[in-house]
Structure formats: C-alpha cells, structure tokens
Amino acid sequence: MKPVWIYDTKDDTDATIVIEETDEGVFLYTANQVDKRGENGKATVADCNIRKFNALTGELIWQKDYQCVYNYYINGGALGTPILGKDDISNMVIFNICFTGSNSDGTMVALDKKTGNEIWKKKLASYSWCSPLDFKSSDGKTYMVYSDFAGKMYLLDPMNGKTLDSVSLEGNVESSPAIYNDTIVVGSYARKIFGIKVK
C-alpha cells in the first residue's frame, strides 16, 4: 500500500470517518478530539475541528471549529461516528461533541454538507461518547437517537434538533446503538442491554 495524501489533524481522530459518493465527487467527513494538544499543561481548551475533505485528493473543503475543555483523564471533542444524512435529511451531517463548556456537557450540531454552515445546534447537559443513530419511520420521516453520560437515551427530530422523548438506561452509555425494525438495542454501565421500542 502507498499513501496518496496525508493531512495533519493536530490531534487524535477517534470518531469513525464517514464517506459519501455524490455526483460532485467522493467526500469524507471527520472530526478530531482534544487530547494531544492539552498534554503536559500545553492547553486547557482547544478546538474540535469538524472537516470535510475530497476523499481522492485530500483537499480540505470546509472546516468548522468548536472549543472544548481539555481533561487529562477523559478527552473532549468528537468520539462518536457522525450521522451522514440521507433521504429527508440528505443535506446534513450530524456530530456530537464532548466538553464544549465544561467537563460534563456537550453539543450536538447539524452542519450543511455543502457549506459547513450550522443548520441547528443543541446544547447537551451531559456529554455523549456514543454514536448517534438515524432511522426512518413507517411514514417515511427520519428520526434520531443518542445516549449520554447521565444514562438517558433521547429521541430527536433531526430536522431541527428538538427533543421528542427520552428513556433511562440506568448508567453512562459508551456503546453505539443498533436498530432492527422499531427496536433499538444498546448497552450501558448498568451492566444491562436494553431493547427500546420506538413508536
């Protein structure tokens, strides 16, 4: 194997990179965390950099920055895989970002795929490590869920970020959820796996 392009992200990339093939080209969406830039007292805050690249050339298409708090034992920034919108939310990519105001909170953002501009931004009282999940209902509308450090799963409208419902998972959630038909399955620190019915 031979690298054809390299980009210095300035920090760790723990969140899975997502790829999209369109009529305009093939693109990557990615975000880093706040880790190496804060080591040994170098910084108490740094930006989580959300970026879109041309997947074939490495050209940076756009970048959106969100300031995060550095914590030596738990990293801020993006750790979960973003939602790559499709169907009725095909214009957006959605990221959850940890520690955007303190070492306990977070932010969920939906960005326009073409421009990187914010479509909506939602302040999270508790940060989220796990990947958000989108799914389509029987009426053809897309919904999304995410789980947080406080042990709750939230149902959102991805068009505007509005919370529609929530349920307790009894402990912090690091795992990413899976869905089959109308049942979401996820594990938590409660040492349990939950099957959540969505209506």
Each model region followed by its residue ranges:
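Extracytoplasmic/lumenal domain signature
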Residues: 1-199
